[in-house]
Every structure is written in structure tokens, then in C-alpha cells.
């Protein structure tokens, strides 16, 4: 490495700044132009103020899209209520008849 003049500020060291100015091109070569170009173009990182996007205005024909949902009856669960009790009784009878040892 070449010795650097200690009186120079770090941003004025030779090779610290590119010879050409930054531009708006997003090609691969321009994206790697300098650290700033790489961060903004290559990585998409910018710390500037973000522009506020305007919301789209609603079309004049639609009102507020607040149409109520029509009430629907809750589905009734249908099935044998005694079916589960019968299966429990079968399991109990099997456990009683099976010897453990």
C-alpha cells in the first residue's frame, strides 16, 4: 500500500472517489460504480425522504362499499348425540374384559 498523506482528510485520499460522476443508469457497471451507487442501485437502500403515494380516488359509481352482509342462519350440527356415548360404553366394556396380565 502506498503511504497516504496524514494531513489529507479520509474522503480526499486518492482512490476514495471515482473519476466519473454518478448517474441514473441502473446497469451492472453503474450499480458497482461506487459505494453510494451500490447501496442505492444495487441494494435499493436510500435514506432520503420517501414520497407519499396518493390514494386512488373511488370511482363515482361506487358509494362507500359499506353494503351490509345479509344475515345467514348458523349451520345446525346434525348427528347422533348418543353415538359418542355408545362408543364410550364399547371401549369401557372392552377394557373390563381384557386381562392385563
Swiss-Prot record:
Interaction with human CREBBP as annotated region, ranges: 1-24
Modified residues (N6-acetyllysine): 28, 50-51
Region feature (Disordered): 47-101
Modifications made to the protein after synthesis: Asymmetrical arginine methylation by host PRMT6 seems to diminish the transactivation capacity of Tat and affects the interaction with host CCNT1.
Motif Cell attachment site, residue numbers: 78-80
Binding site for Zn(2+) 2: 25, 27, 30
Region (Cysteine-rich): 22-37
Family indicated by similarity: Belongs to the lentiviruses Tat family.
Subunit comment: Interacts with host CCNT1. Associates with the P-TEFb complex composed at least of Tat, P-TEFb (CDK9 and CCNT1), TAR RNA, RNA Pol II. Recruits the HATs CREBBP, TAF1/TFIID, EP300, PCAF and GCN5L2. Interacts with host KAT5/Tip60; this interaction targets the latter to degradation. Interacts with the host deacetylase SIRT1. Interacts with host capping enzyme RNGTT; this interaction stimulates RNGTT. Binds to host KDR, and to the host integrins ITGAV/ITGB3 and ITGA5/ITGB1. Interacts with host KPNB1/importin beta-1 without previous binding to KPNA1/importin alpha-1. Interacts with EIF2AK2.
HAMAP family assigned to the protein according to its UniProt record, in alphabetical order: HIV_TAT (MF_04079)
Protein name, per record: Protein Tat
